[in-house]
Amino acid sequence: MPSLHADRSKPVVIDTNQMEWQASPAPGVWRKRLELVGDAEKGMVTSVVRFDPGCGFPAHDHPLGEEVLVLDGVFADEFGEYPAGTMTLLPTGSRHEPVTADGCTLFVKLCQYAGEDRPMRRTDTRNPDGWRQTYAGREVFDLFDEPGWPEKIRLSRLAPGTEVPHHVHEGGEEVFVVSGELADEHGRYRAGTWMRFPDGSSHRPWTESGCLLYVKTGHLGS
């Protein structure tokens, strides 16, 4: 498979609800790839992945790290079980063997968390103590914000009717709509939509219904 949306200087908006599931090398594991740079199976890739009940993926290393957000169901490996809302950060040098009993859907970023000195984290974002309010109508759950690394990763929860101030994406911004609907001056984005905004772009988002977002910033700079 050739590279897909590899030019990170260009904006991308993809509604994954309109995509067909593609088979992976593992039986019962399906994917919708959103961006790909390099080798089809070992390159840098962002995707939505679905595991059928009782299926798994062979044990594998993470030479450049992996990020996994459980969207629904229960994801598992030899270290534990991770229900919907769990965010796992696996740095360079980590290894696991994924499986699921009842099926699950994941948002996965492979080869985008490189560095042996990065922390390994498994965070249950259902924990109310992890959320903090930044302004009226917006709460965030910080998942990664460490000195020495350009990117920040968080979940952002917007209450119905919330307007986000106009802002410039210094270092770029990536958003996946986990639930609800987000809008800005360019369009409307329902659950399952993935967006990548390049360094220096800007927008003024809002939500009428409320929404939950995965947000990664600062990783798309030159």
Enumerate the predicted regions with their spans.
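Glycine- and acidic-residue-biased ligand/ion/polar-headgroup-sensing regions
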Residues: 52-55, 62-77, 169-185, 191
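Acidic/His-leaning functional-site neighborhoods
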Residues: 139-193, 208
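Short acidic-glycine-tyrosine-enriched beta hairpin
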Residues: 76-95, 184-203
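Short histidine-centered beta-strand/loop micro-motifs
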Residues: 58-62, 79-80, 98-99, 164-169, ...
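A short, N-terminal "cap"/entry segment at the start of jelly-roll beta-barrel domains
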Residues: 1-41, 103, 107-152
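Small beta-barrel nucleic-acid-binding modules, principally OB-folds
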Residues: 44-53, 57-60, 152-159, 167
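Ligand-binding loop in jelly-roll beta-barrel domains
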Residues: 29, 81, 92-117, 199-222
